[in-house]
Amino acid sequence: PFMATSCCPAWSVMAKKEFPGFAPYISMTMTPMVLTARLQKRRNPGCKIAFIGPCAAKKLEASRRSVRSDVDFVLTFEELRGMFEAKSIDFSQIPDQEAQYAASAPGVGFAASGGVAKAVEEVIEKLEPGRQVKTVYAEGLRECRQMLRMARTGKYNGYLLEGMACPGGCIAGAGTVQPPEKSRRLLEQYKAKAPKSNPADSDYTEYLDIICEDEQSWDPVARH
């Protein structure tokens, strides 16, 4: 009756555990961490993958048997800051490097609540103009549970349900080092500099062939 996003591992695990009947409706799309890691492993055999971000749930995800060989290390921003402080590394003394803006603006927006649903809406509008897309999103596990309860009543039949375990989305993860609102403002600035305005135009779409080639050999468990 609906489809739920799978990019937040904490959300998808909660949904399948507390609402087992909804498991078939959770997208089979792999999380950004796993997908990026697997693509890089195929493009650069022998490389090591380190995920660095605000999400603590990525540690549990990376420990899964089906993911271990793809993601070698997971660090939160808080842990990384601690490592730099232990080595007396002062960021203010490090020369700036030009930022790389390879993702589309909606792709960058994935990190904030509502961003995944928005990206899907924009892609569908580009590919099939005029097609109605019904979406709803929840942030924080309390809201996520409420959204699923409403879905159980049939309120969201035909909807895309976006769930983010952390209020505010990934930018407000347990391993962040700054207030979520500041992160959101910086994220909006980053989005404004993105070279592509629609995910369908992203340069990364050329790697879809790699995904299709190995689709059947990839463990579906890792996609949740």
Give, region by region, the residue ranges found by the protein language model:
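Iron-sulfur-associated redox domains of electron-transfer enzymes in respiratory
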Residues: 1-224
